[in-house]
Amino acid sequence: MMMPELPEDLLVEILCRVPATSLKRLRSTCKLWNHLYNDKRFKSKHCHKAPRQSLILMWKNFGFSSISINLQRVSPIEVTGELNLIDHHSSLGMFRNSPLCQTSGLLLCVNVEKINTRLVVWNPCTGKTKWIQHRRMGYICNYALGSYQDKKSDNNSYKILSHGIYGGQEFEIYEINSNSWRILDVTVDSSLYIENVSLKGKTYWFATDGNDKPCDLFLICFDYTTERFERLCLPYQIPYFRNTSLSVVKEEKLSVLLQPSLTSKTQIWVTNKIGEAKVLSWIKFLTVDLKPEIKYGIKFLVDEENKVLVYEQNFVINGKNNMIYVVGEDNEVREVVFRVGLKPLFFYYVPSLTQIRQGND
């Protein structure tokens, strides 16, 4: 007995609640499902109603992989999938792993070939890309990707923020909707760190006031709607930190790792859900005793459910390099066997059907 066909409006209501990764596998089931997968209105509905499934992505050996880390026991990292950037202009093999920024299921990668800088905004779930030429040749920049609510379409739209790394604080904005760069009329007196993360329409950096005297570290965020910077306080203030790092918790919260100088005691703090309150508040997640030989460059993830910190270190330490560590409330540090390439960079990624506007779309 054949199953009756569902009305299209009912099918839409069902499929818009299916996670993006599962929907990607289902698109080959029939022409209608494949059509919905590419339909702009369906994608917009899906972004609002579909459950968020967080993956761990790793950049390694000039490519991306999805990975699984067993938090309960010591076991090798499992590579669960490979993600390929397909475009006739270039290949991911020519991309450097830093800077790398992501928001709303989109990744921003930067390719520098001699004096030519090219950027690509990429949705790994849909495979769609948008290639962008930076108008300044031979100018070394830091980049960030963020979103804002477009008043005309009432949909999320995207901008890229760039600023010089070595000298100068001139900021430029690239609007994906208009395919154009423009200089941003803002002045920032602080010195921004290179590392940044984007969350809920804003990008965050560590920053200092940039004078020669000991000065407190703080956060600066850039709002892509107002195109203005805002200064934010960290959980506590001291003149010197040995280690600092930023991370995003499943596209909902901001997390910071703070290790004061002359100690291995490290605190991990997590904010309230970004966007749900006007005031940013901090909750101490863990205090752990990281190895004192850990140097600058630590990257980390927070697993709130299992109450553990996962961090990696790319420097050679006691003959070891590229190690991943898992540490929990018991302060027991476990080394995870790492066999997936050199100089990894890993982060939480939430797949989505987010569209990338192309030219006259």
Swiss-Prot record:
This is Putative F-box protein At3g25460. CDD domains: F-box_AtFBW1-like. PANTHER family: BNACNNG10540D PROTEIN, F-BOX PROTEIN CPR30-LIKE. Transmembrane segments: none annotated. Pfam families: F-box (PF00646), FBA_1 (PF07734). Residues 1-45 form the F-box domain. Coiled coil: none annotated.
